[in-house]
C-alpha cells in the first residue's frame, strides 16, 4: 500500500476501471486497487488513487477530487461481461471515470464516501424525472413506493436486493422497491395514464411495423380514405362516377357499375394507378370506362392524382403489349389520355397489330403520329421509357420504373382518318391547335407528385406540354423531337432507369467513407454506460468546483497527470512541445523545460561544426526554436568560409597559448 499517513485513508478496495472514452472498444476494463484519501486534516488535496495491486508503491494515477463535478451511481451498461454489474462514475473536468464494483454494498460505500468528501448533494430533478420514466416503462409492475423523495441517500438501497429487469423495456435496471420509502406522488395523478401512454407508443410501433409487412391493399385503402376525405368522389375504395370523375378500383375488386362496358386488361398491361388516382374529363355520365386489374405496387403509392378523362388502352393476349417491336408496356404504369368533352360514347379501340405485321425500327423510336383534329381521339398507352436493351423479359418489366409513362397514340382507331407527322417544334399530347408552344410548357419536377395534365371541359384546342430530357439511347429516325412523349416521374424509382444519377457507393468492392462515422456514433452510445431509473446523481449545489477548491485554500494538485507505471501507458501520454525535452519533468512547474530545450537548440544549430563550440553564437541562437533549424541549412558559402577561417584561427591561438601556460606552471 502506498505511503502516507493511515489517518487520511477513507476507503480502499478493488474496482474495475474503464479506459478513456475514445478507447472503450479497443482496451479492456482493468482491475485496480483504489485508495480514497482525505486531506482535510493534513492540508493535502482530496484524491482518489489507484494502483496496479495492493503492494504497489507508486500510483498509476491520482484523481484530484477537487476537480470532481458529479457522481452517478447505478448506471446501466450494455457490455456483456458488465451487464449485471454495479457501475458508478466520477465526472471530472479532465475525464469521466467509470468504475465497477463487485457488489451493490461496495458501490454504495464508495459513492457515499466520495460524496461526503466532495460535499455533494443528490440531484433532485434528475432523480424524479428518471423515476417517472421508470414507472412509465414498467407499467403495472411499478409500485407507488418507487416515487420517493430525492433526499434519501444511496445507502438506503442496501436493504433492497438488486433486481434487474428481464423484460425488453427501455431500461435494463428495474427500480428496487423499498417499503420504508414514502411516496411523494399525489393521488390525483393517475398511474394508469403513464401506462396507457406506453401502450399507445407500443401500438404505434406495431402499426408502423405492420405497415411494412402487410400487402398493398391496406396501403391503398389508406390512400382511398385520404382521397375520399379531400375530394369526396371515392368511397371505400370503389370508384364512383361523380361529376365527371372516374376512379380506378382497387386490385382484385371489380366495379359492378360499369360491368357491361368494362374492358379488362391482362395482368401485364395493368396500370399501377391506385384508387388515389382520379380521372377528370367530360361531364356526361354514360361514357365507357375501362377498369384495370391493377397490381399492387408499394413504391408508387405516393404519386399524385393523375387527371385524365378515361382509360382507353388496347389489350393483347400476349404477355406484354408491344407496339411494332418498339415499345413494351410495363405492368406498373399509369395511363394518361385527353378526352373530348363533347363525346358521349366511345367504342373500345381495336386490338393493335401483331409484331409480324409491323415495321421494324430501332428500339425506343416513334413510328407514326395521328393527325390532330377535333374529331380525332388519341388513345393513350402506358409505355415505359426503354433506353437500354430490346430484350425485355417479364422480370425486367416488373423491376422497371412504375413512375414514368409516355402517352403514345395507338394505331387503328376508328375515329382517326389518316396518319400524318406533326411539326417537330410542336408535338401535342392529345390534340392541340395552340399558336404558341412556349406558353404551354410546364416545367417538370422529378421529385414532385403533382397533377401533370388537366383538360378543361370548355376548351377543345388547349392542352399542356411537358418537356422531357431524353436518355442517351433515345433514337428518333423520323425526325420527331424528344418532347413528343411527355414524361412524368415519381419520387420512388425513377433513378433506377436514368443513367446520370448513379450512386457509385453501391458498388460491391467500393468502400464507403461515411460508414466509420456512423459506427463511431453507435459505439459511443452502446459502449458508454447510461443512466437508468435507479441511477442517482450527486453534485454540488452551484455545480461549480472552483469555489469549493478555493474554500479549502488548497492549490490544484499537479499529480493528477503523474503516472510512472507502464500498465496504463495509453492514458498517461503527455504531449511534448520539443522532441529534445524528453527528460522527466519534476513536480512543480514546467518552467525548467524551455531552458533545457534552449540549450539543446544551441548545439543543434551548430551541428555542422561539431568540434568547435562557438561562444559568441549563443546570444544570437538563444531565441531560435527547433522549427527554425532549416535556416542553418541554407547558408551563404562566403560567410561560412569566413566563419570557418575565423574559428580555425581562434583554435590555433588557443592551442599555441596552452604550452606557454604549461611552461609557466
From Swiss-Prot:
<feature type="modified residue" description="Phosphothreonine">
    <location>
        <position position="388"/>
    </location>
</feature>
<feature type="modified residue" description="Phosphotyrosine">
    <location>
        <position position="441"/>
    </location>
</feature>
<feature type="short sequence motif" description="SH3-binding">
    <location>
        <begin position="348"/>
        <end position="355"/>
    </location>
</feature>
<dbReference type="GO" id="GO:0005829">
    <property type="term" value="C:cytosol"/>
</dbReference>
<dbReference type="GO" id="GO:0005547">
    <property type="term" value="F:phosphatidylinositol-3,4,5-trisphosphate binding"/>
</dbReference>
<dbReference type="GO" id="GO:0030316">
    <property type="term" value="P:osteoclast differentiation"/>
</dbReference>
<feature type="compositionally biased region" description="Polar residues">
    <location>
        <begin position="578"/>
        <end position="600"/>
    </location>
</feature>
<feature type="modified residue" description="Phosphoserine">
    <location>
        <position position="278"/>
    </location>
</feature>
<feature type="region of interest" description="Disordered">
    <location>
        <begin position="408"/>
        <end position="445"/>
    </location>
</feature>
<dbReference type="GO" id="GO:0043306">
    <property type="term" value="P:positive regulation of mast cell degranulation"/>
</dbReference>
<comment type="function">
    <text>Adapter protein which acts downstream of several membrane receptors including cytokine, antigen, hormone, cell matrix and growth factor receptors to regulate multiple signaling pathways. Regulates osteoclast differentiation mediating the TNFRSF11A/RANK signaling. In allergic response, it plays a role in mast cells activation and degranulation through PI-3-kinase regulation. Also involved in the regulation of cell proliferation and hematopoiesis.</text>
</comment>
<keyword id="KW-0963">Cytoplasm</keyword>
<feature type="region of interest" description="Disordered">
    <location>
        <begin position="338"/>
        <end position="396"/>
    </location>
</feature>
<dbReference type="InterPro" id="IPR001849">
    <property type="entry name" value="PH_domain"/>
</dbReference>
<comment type="subunit">
    <text>Part of a complex composed of EEIG1, TNFRSF11A/RANK, PLCG2, GAB2, TEC and BTK; complex formation increases in the presence of TNFSF11/RANKL. Interacts with HCK. Interacts with SHC1; may mediate interaction with receptors. Interacts with SYK. Interacts with PI-3 kinase. Interacts with GRB2 (via SH3 2 domain). Interacts (phosphorylated) with PTPN11. Interacts with TNFRSF11A (via cytoplasmic domain). Interacts (phosphorylated) with 14-3-3 family proteins SFN, YWHAB, YWHAE, YWHAG, YWHAH, YWHAQ and YWHAZ; prevents interaction with GRB2 and attenuates GAB2 signaling.</text>
</comment>
<feature type="modified residue" description="Phosphoserine">
    <location>
        <position position="282"/>
    </location>
</feature>
<feature type="compositionally biased region" description="Polar residues">
    <location>
        <begin position="160"/>
        <end position="170"/>
    </location>
</feature>
<dbReference type="GO" id="GO:0005886">
    <property type="term" value="C:plasma membrane"/>
</dbReference>
<feature type="short sequence motif" description="SH3-binding">
    <location>
        <begin position="499"/>
        <end position="508"/>
    </location>
</feature>
<feature type="modified residue" description="Phosphoserine">
    <location>
        <position position="420"/>
    </location>
</feature>
<dbReference type="GO" id="GO:0043491">
    <property type="term" value="P:phosphatidylinositol 3-kinase/protein kinase B signal transduction"/>
</dbReference>
<feature type="modified residue" description="Phosphoserine">
    <location>
        <position position="612"/>
    </location>
</feature>
<feature type="compositionally biased region" description="Polar residues">
    <location>
        <begin position="357"/>
        <end position="379"/>
    </location>
</feature>
<feature type="modified residue" description="Phosphotyrosine">
    <location>
        <position position="632"/>
    </location>
</feature>
<feature type="compositionally biased region" description="Polar residues">
    <location>
        <begin position="548"/>
        <end position="566"/>
    </location>
</feature>
<feature type="modified residue" description="Phosphoserine">
    <location>
        <position position="165"/>
    </location>
</feature>
<feature type="modified residue" description="Phosphothreonine">
    <location>
        <position position="328"/>
    </location>
</feature>
<feature type="compositionally biased region" description="Polar residues">
    <location>
        <begin position="646"/>
        <end position="659"/>
    </location>
</feature>
<feature type="modified residue" description="Phosphothreonine">
    <location>
        <position position="382"/>
    </location>
</feature>
<keyword id="KW-0597">Phosphoprotein</keyword>
<feature type="modified residue" description="Phosphotyrosine">
    <location>
        <position position="290"/>
    </location>
</feature>
<feature type="modified residue" description="Phosphoserine">
    <location>
        <position position="150"/>
    </location>
</feature>
<feature type="region of interest" description="Disordered">
    <location>
        <begin position="491"/>
        <end position="517"/>
    </location>
</feature>
<feature type="modified residue" description="Phosphotyrosine">
    <location>
        <position position="263"/>
    </location>
</feature>
<feature type="domain" description="PH">
    <location>
        <begin position="8"/>
        <end position="119"/>
    </location>
</feature>
<dbReference type="GO" id="GO:0045121">
    <property type="term" value="C:membrane raft"/>
</dbReference>
<feature type="compositionally biased region" description="Polar residues">
    <location>
        <begin position="430"/>
        <end position="439"/>
    </location>
</feature>
<feature type="modified residue" description="Phosphothreonine">
    <location>
        <position position="284"/>
    </location>
</feature>
<feature type="modified residue" description="Phosphothreonine">
    <location>
        <position position="262"/>
    </location>
</feature>
<dbReference type="GO" id="GO:0008284">
    <property type="term" value="P:positive regulation of cell population proliferation"/>
</dbReference>
<dbReference type="GO" id="GO:0043325">
    <property type="term" value="F:phosphatidylinositol-3,4-bisphosphate binding"/>
</dbReference>
<dbReference type="InterPro" id="IPR046355">
    <property type="entry name" value="Gab1-4-like"/>
</dbReference>
Amino acid at each position: 500500500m502506498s505511503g502516507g499517513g493511515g489517518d487520511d485513508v477513507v476507503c480502499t478496495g478493488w474496482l474495475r476501471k474503464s479506459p478513456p472514452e475514445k478507447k472503450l472498444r479497443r482496451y479492456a476494463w482493468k482491475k485496480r486497487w483504489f485508495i480514497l484519501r482525505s486531506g482535510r486534516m493534513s492540508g493535502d488535496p482530496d484524491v482518489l488513487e489507484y494502483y496496479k495491486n495492493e503492494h504497489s508503491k507508486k500510483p498509476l494515477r491520482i484523481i484530484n477530487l477537487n476537480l470532481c463535478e458529479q457522481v452517478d451511481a447505478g448506471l446501466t451498461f450494455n457490455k456483456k461481461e458488465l451487464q449485471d454489474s454495479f457501475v458508478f462514475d466520477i465526472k471530472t473536468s479532465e475525464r469521466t471515470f467509470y468504475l465497477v464494483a463487485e457488489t451493490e454494498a461496495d458501490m454504495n460505500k464508495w459513492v457515499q464516501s466520495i460524496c461526503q468528501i466532495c460535499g455533494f448533494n443528490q440531484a433532485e430533478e434528475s432523480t424524479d424525472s428518471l423515476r417517472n420514466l421508470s414507472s412509465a416503462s414498467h407499467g403495472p409492475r411499478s409500485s407507488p413506493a418507487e416515487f420517493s423523495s430525492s433526499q434519501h441517500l444511496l445507502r438506503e438501497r442496501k436493504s433492497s436486493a438488486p433486481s434487474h429487469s428481464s423484460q425488453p423495456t427501455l431500461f435494463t435496471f428495474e427500480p428496487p422497491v423499498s417499503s420504508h420509502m414514502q411516496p411523494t406522488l399525489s393521488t390525483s395523478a393517475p398511474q394508469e395514464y403513464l401506462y396507457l401512454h406506453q401502450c399507445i407508443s407500443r401500438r404505434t410501433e406495431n402499426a408502423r411495423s405492420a405497415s411494412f409487412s402487410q400487402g398493398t391493399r391496406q396501403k391503398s385503402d389508406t390512400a382511398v380514405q385520404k382521397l375520399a376525405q379531400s375530394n369526396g368522389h371515392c368511397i371505400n375504395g370503389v370508384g364512383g362516377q361523380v361529376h365527371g370523375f372516374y376512379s380506378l378500383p382497387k386490385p382484385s375488386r371489380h366495379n359492378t357499375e360499369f360491368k357491361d362496358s368494362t374492358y379488362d386488361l391482362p395482368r401485364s398491361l395493368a396500370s399501377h394507378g391506385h384508387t388515389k388516382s382520379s380521372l377528370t374529363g367530360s361531364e356526361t355520365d354514360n361514357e365507357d370506362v375501362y377498369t384495370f386489374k391493377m397490381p399492387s405496387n408499394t413504391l408508387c403509392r405516393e404519386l399524385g392524382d393523375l387527371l385524365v378523362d378515361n382509360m382507353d388502352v388496347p389489350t393483347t393476349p400476349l404477355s406484354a403489349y408491344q407496339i411494332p417491336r418498339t415499345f413494351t408496356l410495363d405492368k406498373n404504369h399509369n395511363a394518361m389520355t385527353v378526352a373530348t368533352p363533347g363525346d358521349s360514347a366511345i367504342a373500345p379501340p381495336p386490338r393493335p397489330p401483331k409484331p409480324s405485321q409491323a415495321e421494324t425500327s430501332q428500339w425506343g423510336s416513334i413510328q407514326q403520329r395521328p393527325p390532330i383534329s377535333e374529331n380525332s381521339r388519341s388513345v393513350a398507352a402506358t409505355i415505359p421509357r426503354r433506353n437500354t436493351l430490346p430484350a425485355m423479359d417479364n422480370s425486367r418489366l416488373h423491376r422497371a420504373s412504375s413512375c414514368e409513362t409516355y402517352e403514345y397514340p395507338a394505331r387503328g382507331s376508328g375515329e382517326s382518318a389518316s396518319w400524318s407527322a406533326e411539326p417537330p417544334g410542336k408535338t401535342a399530347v392529345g390534340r392541340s391547335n395552340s399558336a404558341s408552344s412556349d406558353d404551354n410548357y410546364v416545367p417538370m419536377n422529378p421529385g414532385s407528385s403533382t397533377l401533370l395534365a388537366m383538360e378543361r371541359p370548355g376548351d377543345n384546342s388547349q392542352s399542356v406540354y411537358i418537356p422531357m430530357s431524353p436518355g442517351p439511347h433515345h433514337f428518333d429516325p423520323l425526325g420527331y423531337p424528344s418532347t413528343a412523349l411527355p414524361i412524368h416521374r415519381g419520387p420512388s424509382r425513377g433513378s433506377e432507369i436514368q443513367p446520370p444519377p448513379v450512386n457509385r457507393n453501391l458498388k460491391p468492392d467500393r468502400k464507403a467513407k461515411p460508414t466509420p462515422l456512423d459506427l463511431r456514433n453507435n459505439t459511443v452510445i452502446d459502449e458508454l454506460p447510461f443512466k437508468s431509473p435507479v441511477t442517482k446523481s450527486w453534485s454540488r449545489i452551484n455545480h461549480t468546483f472552483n469555489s469549493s477548491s478555493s474554500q479549502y485554500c488548497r492549490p490544484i494538485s499537479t499529480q493528477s497527470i503523474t503516472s510512472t507505471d507502464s500498465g496504463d501507458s495509453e492514458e498517461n501520454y503527455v504531449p511534448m512541445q520539443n522532441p529534445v525535452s524528453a527528460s522527466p519533468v519534476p513536480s512543480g512547474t514546467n518552467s525548467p523545460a524551455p531552458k533545457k530545450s534552449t540549450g539543446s537548440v544551441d548545439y543543434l544549430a551548430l551541428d555542422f561544426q561539431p568540434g568547435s563550440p562557438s561562444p559568441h553564437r549563443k546570444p544570437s541562437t538563444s531565441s531560435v526554436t527547433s522549427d527554425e533549424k532549416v535556416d542553418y541549412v541554407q547558408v551563404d558559402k562566403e560567410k561560412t568560409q569566413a566563419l570557418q577561417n575565423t574559428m580555425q584561427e581562434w583554435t590555433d591561438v588557443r592551442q599555441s597559448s596552452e604550452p606557454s601556460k604549461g611552461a609557466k606552471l
